[in-house]
Amino acid sequence: MISKAIIKKVSIAPRKARLVVDLIRGKEIKVAKAILMFTPKSASSIVLKLLNSAEANLAQNINLKSNDFYISEVYVNEG
C-alpha cells in the first residue's frame, strides 16, 4: 500500500531541501525520523512533519504498525 503526502508553499530553497531528502530516501520510517531529528538543517523539521503526516495517513487507512513502513520515493520540486 502506498501513502502520499504533499506540502506546498514552503519558503526554503529546493537545493537545500534536497540535501535533507536525499538522506532519508530508501530508509525505514523509524530510521528516517532519527536522522531528521539530529540533522542540523532548516529543512529537516519540515520534512519530519511531512513524514509524520504520510505515516499517519497510511496507519489510519490500513491499520499496520509503523515498523512495516519504509520510504520508497521522496523528492523536492521547484515551485
UniProtKB/Swiss-Prot annotation:
Q: Organism's domain of life? A: Bacteria
User: Is rRNA-binding set as a keyword in this record?
Assistant: yes
Q: Which InterPro entries does the record associate with it?
A: Ribosomal_uL22, Ribosomal_uL22_bac/org-type, Ribosomal_uL22_sf
Q: Which GO terms describe its cellular component?
A: cytosolic large ribosomal subunit
Q: What are the protein's UniProt keywords?
A: Ribonucleoprotein, Ribosomal protein, RNA-binding, rRNA-binding
Q: Name one GO molecular function term.
A: rRNA binding
What's the family? Belongs to the universal ribosomal protein uL22 family.
Record function comment:
This protein binds specifically to 23S rRNA; its binding is stimulated by other ribosomal proteins, e.g. L4, L17, and L20. It is important during the early stages of 50S assembly. It makes multiple contacts with different domains of the 23S rRNA in the assembled 50S subunit and ribosome.
What interactions and quaternary structure are annotated?
Part of the 50S ribosomal subunit.
The record's PANTHER family line, in alphabetical order, gives: CHLOROPLAST 50S RIBOSOMAL PROTEIN L22-RELATED, LARGE RIBOSOMAL SUBUNIT PROTEIN UL22M
Name of protein: Large ribosomal subunit protein uL22
